[in-house]
Amino acid sequence: MLSPKRTRFRKQHRGRMKGISHRGNQICFGRYALQALEPAWITSRQIEAGRRAMSRNVRRGGQIWVRIFPDKPVTVRPTETRMGSGKGSPEYWVAVVKPGKIVYEMGGVAENIARKAISIAASKMPIRTQFIISG
């Protein structure tokens, strides 16, 4: 699972996901990519599940790049706990993804293989996505 080695602060505010992604919205490394179409928090488990599904599909020869990193801690309070007494402890990490953000990139394979692998990875994501080709 992906997570930061160390952070400056243990806990973060939830924040708001306004607007579109202005950075990380171009294909940089591969030829094919999976682009987010709606805003969401994507957990490190979801990122890893998508990566595994893609790598299992392309086997050798293909290269995969994960363009998002879960750097935001999400805190969860223990069950059956009364209100108050501080914020919960960090449970898992999420990547904040806005519309337009490239999630995965792929290269070194034929388009039909890439399309199949990326569609399997897209089914693991909690958002609508699209397959794009660098032109």
UniProtKB/Swiss-Prot annotation:
A GO CC term assigned to this protein in UniProt: chloroplast
PROSITE patterns: RIBOSOMAL_L16_1, RIBOSOMAL_L16_2
Pfam families attached to this UniProt entry: Ribosomal_L16 (PF00252)
InterPro entries reported in the protein's UniProt record: Ribosomal_uL16, Ribosomal_uL16_bact-type, Ribosomal_uL16_CS, Ribosomal_uL16_dom, Ribosomal_uL16_sf
GO BP terms, alphabetized: mitochondrial translation
Localization, UniProt: Plastid, Chloroplast
Keyword annotations from UniProtKB, A to Z: Chloroplast, Plastid, Ribonucleoprotein, Ribosomal protein
Superkingdom to which the source organism belongs: Eukaryota
Family: Belongs to the universal ribosomal protein uL16 family.
Subunit structure: Part of the 50S ribosomal subunit.
Protein name: Large ribosomal subunit protein uL16c
